[in-house]
Amino acid sequence: MSARAVWDFTTGDARRFCDRLALVIDSAEDFRQRGIESDFVLLLHSGATQFGARTLRGTKFDKPDAVDLAPAHELLQRFASMGGRIVVCGIAMERSAIAEDNVIDGATIERNVFVSSVALQNRGYAYMPIS
């Protein structure tokens, strides 16, 4: 038996993003302690797209009060090291001026993560919206 979920992150608020991602990681650890394997996929689009970028320089998020990406990147790396998959929306990247070579290691790019979301749900993944 495994716990399969697609976590649909759209929030651009760094505090909320990190808090919710920490809860996702906690959930995976909880399942592991119960002897249940987790198969988690994290989708990043809308405001959450920025957290999949290595740097915000030159993007639509490049502002004087831009978020510090380090805490989010640390959590994303931890999520990936546990076997989680990170998928960044190509359409959102284009709209945010985030180049493909500016995406964090371990993440993949899907042109339209709505397609990924529907496909995963049709394969039995629980849909978990995080806005």
Give the label of every model feature segment.
Residues 1-131:
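Secreted/extracellular ectodomain signature
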